[in-house]
Amino acid sequence: MEAIKGSEVNVPDAVFAWLLDGRGGVKPLEDDDVIDSQHPCWLHLNYTHPDSARWLASTPLLPNNVRDALAGESSRPRVSRMGEGTLITLRCINGSTDERPDQLVAMRLYMDERLIVSTRQRKVLALDDVVSDLQEGAGPTDCGGWLVDVCDALTDHASEFIEQLHDKIIDLEDNLLDQQIPPRGFLALLRKQLIVMRRYMAPQRDVYARLASERLPWMSDDHRRRMQDIADRLGRGLDEIDACIARTGIMADEIALVMQESLTRRTYTMSLMAMVFLPSTFLTGLFGVNLGGIPGGGWRFGFSLFCILLVVLIAGVTLWLHRSKWL
């Protein structure tokens, strides 16, 4: 493939444009730099910026069917070979487990052995790890190594997020053993996050597996082996997600059971109180009718005797309930 001049990928509002030096480091791209397989270029763009959008729409370095994909709407992870290059869409975890499950950020990239063009709208936090390694001179030396390092960083962030969700589920299970109900919506958010992760990480694992099996010219056997290891690691994370989803279903049933038992207990208590006080309520209502005068109304000890009778009646009903093992 012919070399590319640095001026051809000069985008004023690019997030950054770097030239890999072949020794694990980078340097800012200059107009007179020569871009080839030994010194590939990484151009990172925000496709909502006007200059970046114009460059994506007009540059002859990209196939026509790649332009819309790099600046289009978010889609599920996928990989497509297009001539000498490859179009890849990946998802990255941004944010924490306390956020709503919309923190999966899309990153699209087109690459061949000379040029890496990556686009995003929101910042991809996982790229910070790769950028840091490159700035310290310990990063990838070629396009294949760059792709492996990026996929490894994405998987690290996904695995860490899955582990955080798993820890939350363990804490929730421990609380349920102590009859502690989580706040309303907590379990639903947790389950939604797991489902969203499952939705995007499953095809992303397939992307990694395909990259490991494809004979891409800019990926060595070592790159393919490392990519397969990344796919296997993400597959284990997906197994963990499936187990967590099943556990949240069990916890939802357990929470419903605990709440039903609590409601039954309260209803039972109110029923017992009604049974205890129903006879006394009947007598007080009967005497309160006051037709033809209240019996014993003219006797000075009548009210006291009536109160004693009520106490005896309540005690008798309580004793009966206790012997019947209702109390």
UniProtKB/Swiss-Prot annotation:
It is a multi-pass membrane protein. It holds the Pfam family CorA. The chain crosses the membrane at residues 274-294, 301-321. Its main location: membrane. It comes from the Bacteria. GO terms for cellular component: plasma membrane. The keyword DNA-binding does not apply. It catalyses: Zn(2+)(out) + H(+)(out) = Zn(2+)(in) + H(+)(in). Keywords: Cell inner membrane, Cell membrane, Ion transport, Membrane, Transmembrane, Transmembrane helix, Transport, Zinc. It is found in: Cell inner membrane. Residues 295-300 are periplasmic. Residues 1-273, 322-327 are cytoplasmic. One of its GO terms (molecular function) is cobalt ion transmembrane transporter activity. Zinc transporter. Acts as a Zn(2+):proton symporter, which likely mediates zinc ion uptake. Belongs to the CorA metal ion transporter (MIT) (TC 1.A.35) family. This is Zinc transport protein ZntB. The gene is zntB.
